Swiss-Prot record:
The species this protein was found in: Nitratidesulfovibrio vulgaris (strain DSM 19637 / Miyazaki F)
RNA-binding found in the keyword field: yes
Gene: rpsC
Name of the protein: Small ribosomal subunit protein uS3
Keywords of this entry: Ribonucleoprotein, Ribosomal protein, RNA-binding, rRNA-binding
SMART domains per record: KH (SM00322)
Any single Gene Ontology cellular-component annotation: cytosolic small ribosomal subunit
Length: 213
C-alpha cells in the first residue's frame, strides 16, 4: 500500500524553504520546543485572523516572526495597537525580544491551511461533509488552483464506523518535485468526535528551481 510523504518536507531546499530558520549547537532542542510553543501561542491568540504560516528567524537572542495572514488589519489593529500587544505578550511569556512582520495573503482560496480550516469550520457548523468539500474545491479552482485534493477522516455524518472520504479536481502530482504543492491540515471537533481534514493544492510548476522566499 502506497504511503504519503509530507509534500512540504519532501521539497525542502528544492523549491520550499524552512519555516524555522536558525542554527544552534547547544540549545537546539530548547529552540525547537520554544518554536512549537510560540506557534501554538500565536495561533491561539490570532485564531480569527486567518493565519496560514508562521515563520521564525533567530539572531543574537532576538526572535523575528513573519506572519502570513488573510486579515492583516486584525493582526496589526488600529495604529498598530494589536501587534504591539502581541509583541508585549510574547516578550512576557518567552522572556525574549520579538520583532513581527506581517505579510498579506491576496488569495486565501488557494492557501491550503486556510482552506482546511474553512472546511473544518463548516463541519463544526453541521454542514454536510460532501457539500463542504465540493464547495471549497470549486472555489479554489475558480481562484486559480491547477488542482486540489481534499480528504475528510472520522465519523462522517455521525456514522458508527470511522472512514475516509476524498474529493479531487484537476492535477495534484505529489511525486513531481518541481510541482508547487501546498498542504494544510485542520481538525473539526464535532459532537460525534474529531474529523481530520487534509488539503493538497497544486499551484503550478516551478521551472527555474528557485527556493521560495
Amino acid at each position: 500500500m502506497g504511503q504519503k510523504v509530507h509534500p512540504y518536507g519532501f521539497r525542502l531546499g528544492y523549491n520550499k524553504n524552512w519555516q524555522s530558520r536558525w542554527f544552534s549547537k547547544k540549545e537546539y532542542p530548547g529552540f525547537v520546543f520554544e518554536d512549537h510553543n510560540i506557534r501554538k501561542f500565536v495561533k491561539k491568540t490570532l485564531y480569527h485572523a486567518g493565519l496560514s504560516k508562521i515563520e521564525i528567524e533567530r539572531a543574537g537572542g532576538k526572535v523575528r516572526l513573519i506572519l502570513s495572514t488573510a486579515r492583516p488589519g486584525i493582526v496589526i489593529g488600529r495604529k498598530g495597537v494589536e501587534i504591539e500587544k502581541l509583541r508585549g505578550d510574547l516578550r512576557k511569556k518567552f522572556k525574549r525580544e520579538f520583532s513581527i512582520e506581517v505579510n498579506e495573503i491576496r488569495r486565501p482560496e488557494v492557501e491550503a491551511q486556510l482552506v482546511a480550516e474553512n472546511i473544518a469550520l463548516q463541519l463544526e457548523r453541521r454542514v454536510a461533509f460532501r457539500r463542504a468539500m465540493k464547495r471549497t474545491v470549486s472555489m479554489s479552482r475558480k481562484f486559480g488552483a491547477e488542482g486540489i485534493k481534499v480528504t475528510c477522516s472520522g465519523r462522517l455524518a455521525g456514522a458508527e464506523i470511522a472512514r475516509t472520504e476524498w474529493y479531487r479536481d484537476g492535477r495534484v502530482p505529489l511525486q513531481t518535485l518541481r510541482a508547487d504543492i501546498d498542504f494544510g491540515f485542520a481538525e473539526a471537533r464535532t459532537t460525534y468526535g474529531v474529523i481530520g481534514v487534509k488539503v493538497w493544492i497544486f499551484k503550478g510548476e516551478i521551472l527555474d528551481n528557485e527556493v521560495e522566499q
